[in-house]
C-alpha cells in the first residue's frame, strides 16, 4: 500500500471530485463538508464513471442508470447497483490531499 497525492486542499471544491489513475484503478476523491473521501470511480452496476455523475448530500449518482452510492462508506443505496464501491483511506499532509491504495 502506498499514499498517492491528489492535489492541494485549496484546489478542491465541495462535492466536486478529483480523479487519479493508479495503474488500472480510477479513484475519485471528494471534498465533503466533513472531510475528504476516496472511492472507486467506476460504477459497480455497469462501466460508468461516477465522477461524471451528480453529487449531493454525500451521495454520488451514476450518470448511466442513476444508481446511488454513499461517498463516505461506498455503500450501494439504490438499484440497479447491488455491490458496494471500494473506499480508500485519505489524509492531508502538508496541505496536500492523499489517498492510500
Residue ranges and their predicted role:
Residues 43, 62-65:
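Short cysteine clusters
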